[in-house]
Amino acid sequence: MRAGQRVQESIMNVHASALAEAHLPDEQTTAFAREAIEDLSQQPKKLSPKYFYDATGSELFEAITRLPEYYPTRTELAILKERGSEIAKIIPENAALVEFGAGATTKVRLLLNQSRFAAYVPVDISGDFLQAQANGLKRDFPSLGIYPVAADFTTPFELPKAVASMPKVGFFPGSTIGNFEPHEAQAFLRSARQILGKGAQMIIGADLEKEERLLHAAYNDAAGVTARFNLNVLVRINRELGGNFDLSAFTHGAIYNHDRHRIEMHLISRKNQTVRLLGTSFSFRPGESIHTENSYKYSLDRFAALAQGAGWRVRESWTDSAKMFSVHALEAAE
């Protein structure tokens, strides 16, 4: 065993001991703590973007989607409205619509109004937010079977038995696929294909490459909503895990990495500081950052290759006239 491996194992053993002594309330909180400690122990430091999303984080993200600088949501909505009848034609009747990472219901309502779905399965890590959205849909679609699943959609989960015999159509709108590293995106698409089963289809959004000034504005909005969203992961660590991050000592920053075709979001330390979390100390230099999220931007060809590598075929692709955003209909390659 190499010396570096021994040091890493020693560090992880210390962290495991700290977690055992913390008496955290449930498995989800323990998983959050484990990932946070491991990720902050790396160089460069990072935190998983999935932990942006408690009820506050979900509300902040929905606020981001309404910002004038943030083009993806309104552009995708326009595509779904304009191409809704074409999308409906390729969806089997009486199918179950499974939305991975369900948020606000604006987009899914467009699909539900255009197509004759028998059931809707929203899947999201934020259970309270999920249930509230499901209740609103139930009032407007009383004949639709709605079966919320509180789960991390990036890991395997079981669909409700009520939809077992129905054709399955996955729905993954927004630019969330871009938040994964390319190999993680393929792993997610393979997992989704397995969860949805034989004959699966999927409607998925992907942000497209464009001028850097548009990207910079979208992720560094003038109102500072994206900054509050980014900082929410530290708010959660303080509240749920007993951390002592000084929020005023970190600033939000988003940059475009040309070589890797992605926006990178960071929380940047303003000063020399030390933060404690469950018995572990983390030191920061001025300008040192925590890398919190990536948002990869695709060409149509690169996205098609990504999907093909995960066992899907692109049946149809749609874009807006300015080619800012894309929506793809995928079908499982048998």
Q: Where on the chain are the PLM-derived regions?
A:
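Class I SAM-dependent methyltransferase Rossmann-like catalytic core
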Residues: K45-D54, E59-I91
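Conserved SAM-binding loop of SAM-dependent methyltransferases across substrates and taxa
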Residues: A104-R116
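Conserved beta-strand signature within the Rossmann-like core of class I S-adenosyl-L-methionine
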Residues: I195-E209
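A short glycine-rich, Lys/Arg-flanked "PGG" loop and its adjoining helix->strand segment in the class I
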Residues: Q186-K198
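Conserved class I S-adenosyl-L-methionine
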Residues: N94-G103
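Conserved SAM/SAH-binding beta-strand->alpha-helix loop
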Residues: S126-G127
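Substrate-binding/catalytic lobe of Class I Rossmann-like enzymes that use SAM or dcSAM, i.e.
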Residues: L214-Y296, L300, A304-A310
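N-terminal auxiliary segments of SAM/dcSAM-dependent transferases
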Residues: V7, I11-Y51, S58
